[in-house]
């Protein structure tokens, strides 16, 4: 049963006024009486719409600089009144039924994001009347429609037209879900902000306050259900943040191909975040969350050719990310050469998409061009808890490096060292990366001892016939013993970049000097677990 309810009276009170005039005009044209407050009422009146101020309806003025507007029985009685059950008491107290509530809330998130926002500014942007009306209308969704998103305006008008001015229970229930999601997210933002302010509020330093609230409330929106999770016996879904500010796998548009799997998304994220580190045309190939080939080149085709050479075997069934538009030449090279799960780039040319269309199972994503990296949080779920930390956006430049050996690196060694240092940041620890002429030639990932990662990188290079002599090596963390340096020297490495900080640094540096290796300290670690 559809349980339609006609919309005869609507209360509109919005902070974000995008589309509200057109929506109000559409409601009014369909005979809906309009109630409104403050700035919304003034805007509608300026546009010539017949609108009744809530203060005129209640006989009670707005007061306390707008803090009290809608907190009145004639408003909430009209929203909460159960049709057919509360009619008598509503009539006794001259309460008119309100069939639709259109509300969005004070911009708390935007306010606290502004530089220099004070606690007083934040407090004044905590909406009280708005959430109260939203919750009241959502609670009484059996009789009332609650609208919190301007993106729903057109669909609501269409349904009213299809149902003689009424909305179905299914629609009202869906709108109620959105309303409770909206208020939950809003309260979570406030709780997180206040929770992180507690020490500072008691006179402690800003540093003491930190950025982590005492209770962490997170709100993510489900983008899609997965066929399964990391393994076929696990159920899964993909949730994204609202208003993501940086090009990412979460914001990407899928242009073609099968639905993304859980592992596709995880691996695509790893590839995209790595390729973002490079200003020059770059390609990153990822397999099982680890880069298996990375290169920069004169073009993305050149970069892809060089990245592929690192490890063609592992590249099979991998994820390929570019930091430039996918062009026809690169698309053709990929499709002709290998099986690929996902290609992601800021954009793709029409010619490139015609080529990839021949392989309909290949997933092609475009994410838009990115600018500055946006600070944020990383999460790792543990049984019974959640680890939270800042995103690892740290990266050193040449001017921050310390040469700790007798020999200075050559210009090419230095370039390669900085290149493979960027790659090592995205390789699972213990991470070792060999690079030469701006391409990886061997990657050792995820080993329990650093020396074995170094040996594996050398084996990988030898297997592909890539010359290690004169290459640079990056290690994501310090060398606890000299054995990693000995292994690198045996392979032909002539420059090493690493954080330093081991109690045996002197032994490690001495080993480098014995082998004539230049060694650079970054004083920054990039563990990745």
From Swiss-Prot:
Keywords, alphabetical: Acetylation, Hydrolase, Multifunctional enzyme, Purine biosynthesis, Transferase
GO molecular function: IMP cyclohydrolase activity; phosphoribosylaminoimidazolecarboxamide formyltransferase activity
Positions carrying N6-acetyllysine: 287
Domain MGS-like positions: 1-148
SMART domains: AICARFT_IMPCHas, MGS
PANTHER family linked to this entry: BIFUNCTIONAL PURINE BIOSYNTHESIS PROTEIN ATIC, BIFUNCTIONAL PURINE BIOSYNTHESIS PROTEIN PURH
NCBIfam families for this protein: PRK00881.1, purH
Assigned protein family: Belongs to the PurH family.
Comment, domains: The IMP cyclohydrolase activity resides in the N-terminal region.
Protein name listed in UniProt: Bifunctional purine biosynthesis protein PurH
Gene name, Swiss-Prot/TrEMBL: purH
């Amino acid at each position: 049963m559809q349980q339609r309810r006609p919309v005869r009276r609507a209360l509109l009170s919005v902070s974000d006024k995008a589309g509200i005039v057109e929506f109000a005009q559409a409601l009014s044209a369909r005979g809906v009486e309009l109630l409104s407050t403050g700035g919304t009422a003034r805007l509608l009146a300026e546009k010539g719409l017949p609108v009744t101020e809530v203060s005129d309806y209640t006989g009670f003025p707005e007061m306390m600089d707008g803090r009290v507007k809608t907190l009145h029985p004639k408003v909430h009685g009209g929203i909460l009144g159960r049709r057919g059950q509360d009619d008598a008491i509503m009539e006794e107290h001259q309460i008119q039924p309100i069939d639709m509530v259109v509300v969005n809330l004070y911009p708390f998130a935007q306010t606290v994001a502004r530089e220099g926002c004070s606690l007083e500014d934040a407090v004044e942007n905590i909406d009280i009347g708005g959430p109260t009306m939203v919750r009241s209308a959502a609670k009484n969704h059996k009789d009332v429609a609650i609208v919190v998103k301007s993106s729903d305006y057109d669909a609501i008008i269409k349904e009213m037209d299809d149902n003689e001015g009424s909305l179905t229970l299914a629609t009202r229930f869906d709108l109620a879900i959105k309303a409770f999601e909206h208020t939950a997210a809003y309260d979570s933002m406030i709780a997180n902000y206040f929770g992180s302010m507690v020490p500072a509020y008691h006179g402690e330093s800003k540093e003491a306050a930190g950025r982590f609230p005492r209770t962490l409330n997170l709100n993510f929106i489900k983008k899609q259900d997965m066929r399964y999770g990391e393994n076929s016996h696990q159920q899964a879904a993909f949730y994204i943040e609202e208003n993501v500010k940086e090009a990412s796998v979460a914001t990407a548009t899928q242009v073609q191909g099968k639905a993304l799997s859980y592992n596709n998304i995880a691996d695509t994220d790893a590839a995209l975040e790595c390729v973002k580190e490079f200003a020059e045309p770059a390609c990153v190939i990822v397999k099982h969350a680890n880069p298996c080939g990375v290169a920069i080149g004169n073009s993305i085709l050149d970069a892809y050719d060089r990245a592929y050479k690192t490890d063609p075997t592992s590249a099979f069934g991998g994820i390929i990310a570019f930091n430039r538009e996918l062009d026809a030449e690169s698309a053709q090279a990929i499709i002709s050469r290998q099986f690929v799960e996902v290609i992601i780039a800021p954009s793709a040319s029409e010619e490139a998409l015609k080529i990839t269309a021949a392989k309909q199972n290949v997933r092609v994503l475009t994410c838009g061009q990115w600018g500055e990296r946006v600070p944020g949080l990383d999460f790792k779920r543990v049984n019974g808890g959640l680890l939270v930390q800042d995103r690892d956006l740290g990266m050193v430049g040449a001017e921050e490096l310390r040469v700790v050996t007798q020999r200075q690196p050559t210009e090419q060694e230095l370039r390669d060292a900085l290149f493979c240092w960027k790659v090592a940041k995205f390789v699972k620890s213990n991470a070792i990366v060999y690079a030469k002429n701006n391409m990886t030639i061997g990657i050792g990932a995820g080993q329990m001892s650093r020396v074995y990662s170094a040996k594996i990188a050398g084996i990988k290079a030898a297997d592909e016939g890539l010359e290690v002599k004169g290459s640079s090596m990056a290690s994501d963390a310090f060398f606890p013993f000299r054995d990693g340096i000995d292994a690198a020297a045996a392979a032909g490495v002539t420059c090493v970049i690493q954080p330093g900080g081991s109690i045996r640094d002197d032994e490690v540096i001495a080993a480098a000097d014995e082998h004539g290796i230049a060694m650079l300290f970054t004083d920054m670690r990039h563990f990745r677990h």
